[in-house]
Amino acid sequence: MAVTVEEAPWLGWIVAKALMRFAFMVANNLVAIPSYICYVIILQPLRVLDSKRFWYIEGLMYKWLLGMVASWGWYAGYTVMEWGEDIKAIAKDEAVMLVNHQATGDVCTLMMCLQDKGPVVAQMMWLMDHIFKYTNFGIVSLIHGDFFIRQGRAYRDQQLLVLKKHLEHNYRSRDRKWIVLFPEGGFLRKRRETSQAFAKKNNLPFLTHVTLPRFGATNIILKALVARQENGSPAGGDARGLECKSRGLQWIIDTTIAYPKAEPIDIQTWILGYRKPTVTHVHYRIFPIGDVPLETEDLTSWLYQRFIEKEDLLSHFYKTGAFPPPQGQKEAVCREMTLSNMWIFLIQSFAFLSGYLWYHIIQYFYHCLF
């Protein structure tokens, strides 16, 4: 489609702004990620002497890095409106977030809306597709202890065993609290047809806005962090270094992300900011772990039911622009999530000052050695 004379200045501004944002993102990554790695390296003696304190400091830096990613969307006008139950109330408890997956922007949205939930981001473990391991943020996630999972039948059983070992060695020993999981196993646009064919074959509901979840990873997480806890031996790593024993996994947070007109934001849009300001809506429901069945067949049915309910939530949202009110209430209440501009300024300043500091330290040692 040809660009008119009237549209040319506007299009030029969009392109110029996208280029400036991209340049800033590159600079941000070049100072923040190497600085994070350098701090982690220099703090290794503390990891041996006081593991809990080491992972606390690492978690803070991890939260700041995710805050920087969140700020890219924030200053492009991509904000979040929260609905449903207040998850701040359980920020210090162990929980699993089950999230529907539409696009790469889902991860950025969660990075933003969880920033004001106390220690959650610092003590969080992500389960994400292995392709993210090869992004600029992959090394940070590897150090933090996030898990990269390969999709596909050929890898499924082997990956679940690796996940089980990963939880046993890294979850509680690093004082992790929340796990973020996308049970659909892929983006909506890629899995919808396969899911609908599976539903038709097995007499399950026909879903449009979500796909039927895969239960494998959820099953492994619950067995590792709930079942063994009941037998008196804390799962997820050696907890002897912790000041008090963990009470185990306590909550499932059913999280539903909805975009206006069902048009999701991808990571390119989040970085370049060429889309008009958009409000993403996130709905939370909290389920006590005692209400979640642990037997495979019952757990599968329970998960299916949650995603059938997600379908209803999203259908209502796309028709009305709002999520339905909870049972017994006439109107749903939403909360605008905000980021502090001062906090963003401080973490960005720390990142660039750290980058400057480490550059000169490395340069000094390089000249001393060579």
Curated annotation (Swiss-Prot):
One GO process term, biological-process aspect: phospholipid biosynthetic process
Tissue-specific expression: Ubiquitous. Expressed in heart, kidney, liver, skin, intestine, and thymus. Highest expression is detected in brain and testis.
CC per GO annotation: endoplasmic reticulum membrane
Consequence of gene loss (knockout): Mice are born at the expected Mendelian frequency. They show reduced body fat and increased mortality during early adulthood with an average life span of about 5 months. Mutant mice produce poorly nutritional milk and are unable to nourish their litters leading in high pre-weaning mortality.
Domain of life: Eukaryota
EC number: 2.3.1.62, 2.3.1.22, 2.3.1.-
Keywords: Acyltransferase, Endoplasmic reticulum, Lipid biosynthesis, Lipid metabolism, Membrane, Phospholipid biosynthesis, Phospholipid metabolism, Transferase, Transmembrane, Transmembrane helix
Membrane topology, record value: Multi-pass membrane protein
Motif (HXXXXD motif): 101-106
InterPro entries xrefs: Acyltransf_C (IPR032098), Plipid/glycerol_acylTrfase (IPR002123)
Catalytic activity, reaction form: a 2-acyl-sn-glycero-3-phosphoethanolamine + octadecanoyl-CoA = 1-octadecanoyl-2-acyl-sn-glycero-3-phosphoethanolamine + CoA; 2-(9Z-octadecenoyl)-sn-glycero-3-phosphoethanolamine + octadecanoyl-CoA = 1-octadecanoyl-2-(9Z-octadecenoyl)-sn-glycero-3-phosphoethanolamine + CoA; a 2-acyl-sn-glycero-3-phosphoethanolamine + hexadecanoyl-CoA = 1-hexadecanoyl-2-acyl-sn-glycero-3-phosphoethanolamine + CoA; 2-(9Z-octadecenoyl)-sn-glycero-3-phosphoethanolamine + hexadecanoyl-CoA = 1-hexadecanoyl-2-(9Z-octadecenoyl)-sn-glycero-3-phosphoethanolamine + CoA
GO molecular function per UniProt: 2-acylglycerol O-acyltransferase activity; 2-acylglycerophosphocholine O-acyltransferase activity; lysophosphatidylethanolamine acyltransferase activity; lysophospholipid acyltransferase activity
Chief place of localization: endoplasmic reticulum
Transmembrane stretches, start-end: 22-42, 342-362
Subcellular location: Endoplasmic reticulum membrane
First-level EC class: transferase
The record's note on its domains: The HXXXXD motif is essential for acyltransferase activity and may constitute the binding site for the phosphate moiety of the glycerol-3-phosphate.
Family: Belongs to the 1-acyl-sn-glycerol-3-phosphate acyltransferase family.
Record function comment: Lysophospholipid acyltransferase involved in fatty acyl chain remodeling of glycerophospholipids in the endoplasmic reticulum membrane. Selectively catalyzes the transfer and esterification of saturated long-chain fatty acids from acyl-CoA to the sn-1 position of 1-lyso-2-acyl phosphatidylethanolamines (1-lyso-PE, LPE), with a preference for stearoyl CoA over palmitoyl CoA as acyl donor. Acts in concert with an unknown phospholipase A1 to convert palmitate PE species into stearate ones.
Protein name: Acyl-CoA:lysophosphatidylglycerol acyltransferase 1
